[in-house]
Amino acid sequence: MKRMIALDGAQGEGGGQIMRSALSLSMITGQPFTITGIRAGRAKPGLLRQHLTAVKAATEICGATVEGAELGSQRLVFRPGTVRGGDYRFAIGSAGSCTLVLQTVLPALWFADGPSRVEVSGGTDNPSAPPADFIRRVLEPLLAKIGIHQQTTLLRHGFYPAGGGVVATEVSPVASFNTLQLGERGNIVQMRGEVLLAGVPRHVAEREIATLAASFSLHEQNIHNLPRDQGPGNTVSLEVESENITERFFVVGEKRVSAEVVAAQLVKEVKRYLASPAAVGEYLADQLVLPMALAGAGQFTVAHPSCHLLTNIAVVERFLPVRFTLAETDGVTRVMITKLTD
């Protein structure tokens, strides 16, 4: 019988990522875990609908036995079974993030007995979660280099608070893992600005694009009008394609916040990324930790290690025989992964 891993949900940034990473790793390694103080660092601690959906999805995919899987619970015991490929559908029932639920279960399906499709309904444009276009255009090309083949499709947008969005991913078992080296970003090839609108006047998008164009030379400027019933909602994105990596940044519009202020927030974030020679942005760094750890080697550079990143690393090291080493050099932090030997 494998040992039970005990996790403190209040460690580090104290959010839901601790539990999501633990669920992924438990399904992959077969190691059971218990976590207390779930989301202790949040204003409303405990399991919300999004987190509960992730737990139920993980339970279904591997036939786990679970204790504490209920709304508001701050304690969870998870004993995994065998991961099974298949066609899965999960509904969050709110505007909670579809991609964060997918992020929980897809790594386990890299080790399944056959191909899978996972469809999640809920929120797709959430200020605190990666949108589907980030997964599709930024993360998945890097996963392919590691040897992980999955394809995400956004079937319908769902903005806060209504939700109603749908995201689906098709994924195949991994034959073998490759190491990823992301030390340098390289020269910028082009930048693309994009605005999504649903039930919001077009002049809002035009003002947002104008704000981006005032700060950056945009190769493309795209405005996409979505059906009104998918809103109201507004998202502004800016994609930076460099020689070695593509990064994508986004901001979700808010009521009573002007188009110029919304776009200026995005400009500030992109300028912060470009001011450093680091290859990887803050949020992409979080996404790379688990797949690169499964590969057992690799490295990337980030401007500054966030508390979120450090917390995720700590959880991964509890489950996998790897060590992360962080070294500051030439104005960036180099994150290196090595496999531990017996």
UniProtKB/Swiss-Prot annotation:
- In terms of superkingdom, the source organism counts as Bacteria
Q: Which reaction does it catalyse?
A: a 3'-end 3'-phospho-ribonucleotide-RNA + ATP = a 3'-end 2',3'-cyclophospho-ribonucleotide-RNA + AMP + diphosphate
A GO term for molecular function: ATP binding
Instruction: Please give an example of a GO cellular component term from this record.
Output: cytoplasm
Question: What is this enzyme's EC?
Answer: 6.5.1.4
Q: Which Pfam families match?
A: RTC, RTC_insert
What residue ranges carry the coiled-coil annotation? none
The UniProt entry annotates the active site at: H308
Which positions in this protein are listed as binding ATP? Q103, Y283, L284, A285, D286, Q287
Keyword tags: ATP-binding, Cytoplasm, Ligase, Nucleotide-binding
A GO BP annotation: RNA processing
Report the locations given in the UniProt record.
Answer: Cytoplasm
Q: Sum up the protein's function in the record's words.
A: Catalyzes the conversion of 3'-phosphate to a 2',3'-cyclic phosphodiester at the end of RNA. The mechanism of action of the enzyme occurs in 3 steps: (A) adenylation of the enzyme by ATP; (B) transfer of adenylate to an RNA-N3'P to produce RNA-N3'PP5'A; (C) and attack of the adjacent 2'-hydroxyl on the 3'-phosphorus in the diester linkage to produce the cyclic end product. The biological role of this enzyme is unknown but it is likely to function in some aspects of cellular RNA processing.
Q: Which family does it belong to?
A: Belongs to the RNA 3'-terminal cyclase family. Type 1 subfamily.
What NCBIfam families does this protein map onto? PRK04204.1-2, PRK04204.1-3, RNA_3prim_cycl
HAMAP family, per the entry: RTC
Q: What is this protein called?
A: RNA 3'-terminal phosphate cyclase
Q: Which organism is it from?
A: Escherichia coli O157:H7
